[in-house]
Amino acid sequence: MLAPIQTIARPVSSILPATGALAAKRTFFAPSEVYNKKQVIVTKKTGLDILNDPKLNKGSAFTADEKDRLGIRGLVPPRPQSLEAQYKRCKTNLDKISDPLEKFIYLNHLQNRNETLYYKMILENFVELAPIIYTPVVGEACQKFHKIFTQTRGMYFSTADRGQMSAVAANWPYDDVDVIVVTDGSRILGLGDLGAGGMQIPIGKLTLYVCGGGINPRNVLPIVLDVGTNNKELLNDPLYLGMQHPRLQGEEFHAFVDEWVSAITDRFPKAVIQFEDFMMPNALDLLLKYKDQICMFNDDIQSTGAITLASVLATMRARGGTFADIKKETFLCLGAGSSGVGVCETIVDCIVAEGATREEAYAQFYMFDHKGLLGKGRDDLLPSQQVFMRKEIEGGKTPAELLKKIKPTCLLGLSTCPKLFNKEMLSYVASYCEKPGIFPLSNPTSRSECTAEEAVEFTDGNLIFASGSPFDPVEWKGKTIQTNQCNNSYSFPGIGLGLVSSRATRVPFETFQVCARVIASLGTPEMLATGKIFPDLDNLRAVSLEVGIEVAKMAERMNIATQFPPKGMDWREWLKHNMWQPEYPHIVVKNL
């Protein structure tokens, strides 16, 4: 059984700075909270090559000495400016843009020009800009990727590269890669097959790794596996940038991924690999195939499971109970894809850890897909879905037909179908359950099973609400009902920080249980009383640090860690030391 949560994490009030610049400005980073160390980058680049490298470029911030040493005197304006002055200029320009996608494009151009300034911008304004750089705006950016594309980022491995993937992997110019996020573009958010346009998802996820987990942006790599697309619109669009043929399937697909995994792990043997937005059953098949071979995990199945489990456990606390009360819950899950199955399996693991048998845990779930209940007579289910089949109830029945029989206490929405949590369902659940968990998790916002306003109105304010996309708090009958974003950004950055800092050799399932329990423990009684179960997203670095510490300790306990804190440091000090800060490095030119 996992350690009681009180022993493995501290409440949010004890991990967030209470005074100083961070408390006043509510940004992600404060010098007093980290071990500041001047970054040094050794390069053989000079002149325009420096200015054209977003990892080295400082724009107008190069000093006179740097201009001489780097051969850029006369190539930039003469008076050097600080990073702070550059940030203020860019923020002023960004604020003039009203359209969310245009804001995304502006930030994309900034990232491709000056990464340090880009991350300074995001970190200073995370709550404002997180919906721009990731959900919901990133969904539109993926759909229009081939229309707004201006500059490449990351790597593409296509069907044209079969038999040559090791050579392709060698083309990446940096030897040190800590985190890779890879997608095949087959199931982008709730938008379906977007092919090569899915590249915006790994780019966005890695921005969150940097901002939330403090991973060095020089050491991240977004990748698309372009195995074709079944999207007819893209197949017929002359501007589409990916391979215009139907997707590889079956053995051909798995042979392609096998070659890529071999090539990429040979090139970057220490990298954590996050699989992202692969359709079922490929997502689960790849997870089961590689989980014990390399340091990898599936974000949709496992990270989503971790943060949803954290939401459920925090709901137990908000009701005045303990984590063990999860054994009494009844779950109605709409959606049986990779995310739906992954979420429910993670919750099952927790129920078992609290003392139930696995069969007893599965019996707490009623899962539905587009054909209705996973029940008796359904012979179309994948093995991963069959364990959730209700053998005593005829398959295909709708949630409305079974609602009064099930009497759920927690609603899980992973269907990508809006408005499925309707008035009848929400009002009925709230009529017999104190603070039912209402979790419409589908992204983007347009696919959410209900809005926060609908959930509050139809439950008369009796609920704990957590959604995949952000919703504002709701004013209801003279009080403010807090909303929560049940977003993977609370989980995977801290997981990555712990795995990278310990150089773990694999990612056991226990990782996500530890993560969930840490996050669920962070809400204070005062927060929980208002319906708020998570710290604000602008405190993500503090949350990620707590998660990372426990993940690193778990790796050490399980003998999968290969790197440890230096003598005189504990894990907390070591992880703080490792967290990257947006400050300009000292650039040393050397013939390598």
UniProtKB/Swiss-Prot annotation:
A divalent metal cation binds at E276, D277, D300. It is found in: Hydrogenosome. It comes from the Eukaryota. One of its GO terms (molecular function) is NAD binding. It comes from Neocallimastix frontalis. Divalent metal cations. Prefers magnesium or manganese. The record marks D300 as: Important for activity. Residues 1-27 form a transit peptide. Its EC number is 1.1.1.40. Belongs to the malic enzymes family. One of its GO terms (biological process) is malate metabolic process. Its cofactor is Mg(2+); Mn(2+). GO terms for cellular component: hydrogenosome; mitochondrion. It catalyses: (S)-malate + NADP(+) = pyruvate + CO2 + NADPH; oxaloacetate + H(+) = pyruvate + CO2. This is Malic enzyme, hydrogenosomal.
